[in-house]
Swiss-Prot record:
Lineage, broadest ranks: Archaea, Methanobacteriati, Methanobacteriota, Thermococci, Thermococcales
Function: Endonuclease that specifically degrades the RNA of RNA-DNA hybrids.
E.C. code: 3.1.26.4
Binding site for a divalent metal cation: D7, E8, D105
Gene Ontology molecular functions: manganese ion binding; RNA binding; RNA-DNA hybrid ribonuclease activity
Keywords: Cytoplasm, Endonuclease, Hydrolase, Manganese, Metal-binding, Nuclease
Protein name according to UniProt: Ribonuclease HII
Cellular compartments per GO CC: cytoplasm; ribonuclease H2 complex
Gene3D superfamilies: Ribonuclease H-like superfamily/Ribonuclease H, Ribonuclease hii. Domain 2
Amino acid sequence: MKLAGIDEAGRGPVLGPMVIAAVVVDEGNVPKLEELGVKDSKKLTPKRRERLFDEIVQLLDDYVILELWPEEIDSREGTLNEFEVENFVKALNSLKVKPDVVYIDAADVKEARFGEEIKAKLDFEADIIAEHKADDKFVPVSAASILAKVARDRAIEKLKDQYGEIGSGYPSDPRTRTFLEEYYRKHGEFPPIVRRTWKTLKKIEEKLAKEMKKRRGQTSLEEFFGK
């Protein structure tokens, strides 16, 4: 029996991509994935996940990784959950090896609804099991989670090569906020790698507007930057 798992990494960050990974593994290889320590994906360090990536891929029948960048996220129609459903379906339908069962890490508060919305749009027949914290419960989802996290980590490292220290990309990361504030001060706008629909950016803009008004006596950011 072929089992699929699908998960995302980077849903919440203010910059960088959201990455979706879908994997297909033969039921007989699940114990081998467990032996690698895949089930404890959240306890793994980034370096350990990176080392596991190739070992996991060798045990898979197929896998697909989608990188969804800020421009695509910001231009979506509908909610973030609907966007996730759409791209979970895209990833699963892109698999060349079709699974008999699909395990899904549900983003919706109603697990069954999330699974039903995906099942309705698949181009193949499969049993769907959608649950919260599926990456802790089902090995195929744990494997997908690791692939997604590694792919996002790699994308962030490439961005660091281009922009310098940007932190993890999460709004709660002081390094990320510092990068965004300093970039805005220097350029008068945020870099193209940010999700412009995130409230974090609005808060930073408001903070800097007050700062600039106080320091320069300007009435607006537009005046300050000569726009």
